[in-house]
Amino acid sequence: MTGKEPTLKCVIAWSERRNLCALVADAIETKVGADDVRRLADDALAVFGAYEPSEIRDWLGGLLAEDESALVLEFERWSSLGPGVDSAWLTGRGH
């Protein structure tokens, strides 16, 4: 982990053959802790921490097959609406 301030990331992982959500979530939760990860959908997670997007990508490298993909996005600003997003979790992380 770097010495920078924590930020919000979105991790999207997809496969034509299998659902990757649990596999990817477990791998990331092992590194950052379950309290800083929220599942957004079958293919997407919100992750809060002082990790570079490339670090998170590299954690997933050994899990994904050649035909599977992952994208890690880092946000400077965000906003949310509706019950599908854990508002209390976001508020506690600078929302």
What positions do the PLM features span?
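Short glycine-/aliphatic-rich beta-strand segments at the starts of folded cytosolic domains
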Residues: 2-16
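Conserved, structured core segments of small domains
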Residues: 19-31
